[in-house]
Curated annotation (Swiss-Prot):
GO molecular function, one term: 4 iron, 4 sulfur cluster binding
Protein name: NAD(P)H-quinone oxidoreductase subunit K, chloroplastic
Main location: plastid
Membrane topology recorded in Swiss-Prot or TrEMBL: Peripheral membrane protein
An annotated GO cellular component: chloroplast thylakoid membrane
Subunit structure: NDH is composed of at least 16 different subunits, 5 of which are encoded in the nucleus.
Keywords associated with the record: 4Fe-4S, Chloroplast, Iron, Iron-sulfur, Membrane, Metal-binding, NAD, NADP, Plastid, Plastoquinone, Quinone, Thylakoid, Translocase, Transport
Role according to the record: NDH shuttles electrons from NAD(P)H:plastoquinone, via FMN and iron-sulfur (Fe-S) centers, to quinones in the photosynthetic chain and possibly in a chloroplast respiratory chain. The immediate electron acceptor for the enzyme in this species is believed to be plastoquinone. Couples the redox reaction to proton translocation, and thus conserves the redox energy in a proton gradient.
Protein family per UniProt: Belongs to the complex I 20 kDa subunit family.
Cofactor binding remark: Binds 1 [4Fe-4S] cluster.
Highest taxon of the lineage: Eukaryota
Entries under InterPro entries matching the protein: NADH_UbQ_OxRdtase-like_20kDa, NADH_UQ_OxRdtase_20Kd_su
GO biological process, one term: photosynthesis, light reaction
Amino acid sequence: MNLIEFTLLDQTTPNSVISTTSNDLSNWSRLSSLWPLLYGTSCCFIEFASLIGSRFDFDRYGLVPRSSPRQADLILTAGTVTMKMAPSLVRLYEQMAEPKYVIAMGACTITGGMFSTDSYSTVRGVDKLIPVDVYLPGCPPKPEAVIDAITKLRKKISREISEDRVMSQRENRSFTTNHKFDIRRSTHTGNYDQGLFYQSSYTSEISSKRFFKSKNSVSSHELVN
């Protein structure tokens, strides 16, 4: 405001009081300045890149893309997530500051897409790795749909309580803090060998001997069925 506006404010509303809570003030500041970490692996990310141009101008929402997860509070996953990339994605998510949010963009991120039927290395939904706040279906989604997803996330932020969200994220985890897979019931269909998915150690530490042994034990008949 300039000096004239301050003078007018004092003359017309001398007894005005703004009443709010610290939680509402925190929500308002966060929804107005979301800093996303862009995690794009395939064609869906190209649609998000269209938002940077002047036609859509996503800067008006306060979005400032960051290259470091420690400076971001929103991660936008777009594209296929493989089993080899899963620990890296979880590590990026855990390095983000609390509270943090996730938008799953595209069919490949949400369900595995066309790769989920006969691929042994595709994660069938990123929500098996990290909690998702907004699902954005499409192959690929249009830039207008991305803006709508961001708007829905802003509405969700405005109604939440920060402490409850942090506790919920810590309780509902698919991975442990040291990035090891939990033993869960298989969500994959088919009769092929899935022993490679459940490991007792880090997922990145797979010996080549074990990999090729598991790969050779799968017959073409089992893959077809």
